[in-house]
Amino acid sequence: MKTLFLLAILALVASTTFAQYSVGGGYNDVGGGGGSQQCPQERPNLGSCKDYVMERCFTMKDFPLTWPTKWWKGGCEQEVREKCCQQLSQIAPQCRCDAIRGVIQGKLGGIFGIGGGDVFKQIQRAQILPSKCNMGADCKFPSGYYW
């Protein structure tokens, strides 16, 4: 019974993903990123932004530990955010929201996007990255758009 349930959920996730790509459009149609035609096709390196959104720390002082770790109050949140802001500053303003969405796409919520994380909180963290970095207004991803 569990296997059947897991297969049904996996099929639902796969069909949703397929429908998302076959329908077309994207969050830029809703607003909050705009101008994706002028943006480069390749995804910029925003690894620190992904770590910031997912609340992970990767620093040299954690070198022997290679697995992602949750940060703690007073830990490395500020360091990761500063690296993220530095990476975002190298992207054209009209392309930032598209780049942020692209870097976290498929990374939310654990395995296959099911459980394992607070997806709503992570999406909110991604949307407010530009204002956290003093780079303009927040991104606006469509509601219910969980990749």
Curated annotation (Swiss-Prot):
A GO cellular component entry from the record: extracellular region
GO terms of biological process kind: defense response to bacterium
Domain of life where this protein originates: Eukaryota
The record's account of how the chain is modified after translation: Five disulfide bonds are present.
Keywords: Antibiotic, Antimicrobial, Disulfide bond, Membrane, Plant defense, Secreted, Signal, Toxin
Gene Ontology molecular-function annotations: nutrient reservoir activity; serine-type endopeptidase inhibitor activity; toxin activity
Signal peptide (residue range): 1-19
Record carries keyword Membrane: yes
SMART domains listed in its UniProt record: AAI
InterPro entries for the chain: Allergen/soft/tryp_amyl_inhib (IPR006106), Bifun_inhib/LTP/seed_sf (IPR036312), Bifunc_inhib/LTP/seed_store (IPR016140), Glia_glutenin (IPR001954)
Pfam families assigned: Tryp_alpha_amyl
Subcellular location: Membrane; Secreted, Extracellular space
Propeptide: 20-28
Tissue expression remark: Found in endosperm and aleurone layer of developing kernels, but not in the embryo.
Task of the protein: Acts as a membranotoxin, probably through its antibacterial and antifungal activities, contributing to the defense mechanism of the plant against predators. Forms monovalent cation-selective ion channels in membranes. Contributes to grain texture and hardness.
Name of the featured protein: Hordoindoline-B1
